[in-house]
């Protein structure tokens, strides 16, 4: 994904405000052993790019003064109530060094899963993204999660995911195999079943 940027030589609150008033957004590129570079981007193009999933999880080609640098979006600041991007951070990547990036999950075959189609269950997305470790060339835009065989009451875990070659999942918090999604019984049906069971328990013995 290509991003066109321009070098900027001034920084500070006043300079950033003037940039924003001119329809630009201040940004910085850092990392990969090179000096940080101050840049500016067209605000409207950036604002629309931030709405795209791939902008957050892909290697970006940032063109500055005719030179392209490969980088990841690492952070961005939004105005608390205006549709305004205040600042953006990009991190350079090296082709030979592994990166850690959060990648979105795309859930497939939810409607045809046995637990939904036959059991009338509800799909619960426990995770919507996962952190992966890989070389920049191996970074996937997303990871597919196939729910096509999931029965009611079953849970899909990280270990069940089919990962692209060269990609591993990074887990935190001590749980090495967290749940990704499950299919549960609708709350109304659970309540009805519980009430029916309680009613049967209240019947006098014959």
UniProtKB/Swiss-Prot annotation:
GO BP field: translation
Domain of life: Bacteria
UniProt keywords, alphabetically: Ribonucleoprotein, Ribosomal protein, RNA-binding, rRNA-binding
InterPro entries listed in its UniProt record: Rbsml_bL25/Gln-tRNA_synth_N, Ribosomal_bL25/Gln-tRNA_synth, Ribosomal_bL25_b-dom, Ribosomal_bL25_C, Ribosomal_bL25_long, Ribosomal_bL25_short, Ribosomal_L25_dom, Ribosomal_uL5_bac-type
Gene Ontology molecular function, alphabetical: 5S rRNA binding; structural constituent of ribosome
Family annotation (SUPFAM superfamilies): Ribosomal protein L25-like
Pfam families to which the protein is assigned, alphabetical: Ribosomal_L25p, Ribosomal_TL5_C
GO cellular component, one term: cytosolic large ribosomal subunit
Function: This is one of the proteins that binds to the 5S RNA in the ribosome where it forms part of the central protuberance.
Subunit text: Part of the 50S ribosomal subunit; part of the 5S rRNA/L5/L18/L25 subcomplex. Contacts the 5S rRNA. Binds to the 5S rRNA independently of L5 and L18.
Protein's recorded name: Large ribosomal subunit protein bL25
Originating organism: Ralstonia nicotianae (strain ATCC BAA-1114 / GMI1000) (Ralstonia solanacearum)
Gene: rplY
